[in-house]
Amino acid sequence: MPKLIVLYPPPADVTTFERRYHSEHAPMVVQKIPGLKKFRAAQVLGTPAGAAPYQRVAELYFDSIESLQTAIASAGGQATVAHAMEISTGGPPVVLIAEDDKPV
């Protein structure tokens, strides 16, 4: 199942970022992105060596690469991307497209 992975850098103000992420952005992802099958998000706590280069990671799952591309190109997808850029005050988020390996 293809997924979009979004990595948010540490923001200028962690409290404001986390509040806006939970109260505005996460609901927007679920409500406005068509074809979304599953949404997972996590706060990054650090690395074994200390501080992490990211504050938060999100995974958005779709049935196919085509449905992922259609979702991001949609009006709801574009609004959600714009909002992600707005709240990511530590720099633009890193966006990756991936697919989970099949279990061995």
Where are these regions (language model features)?
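Macromolecular interaction modules
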Residues: 1-104
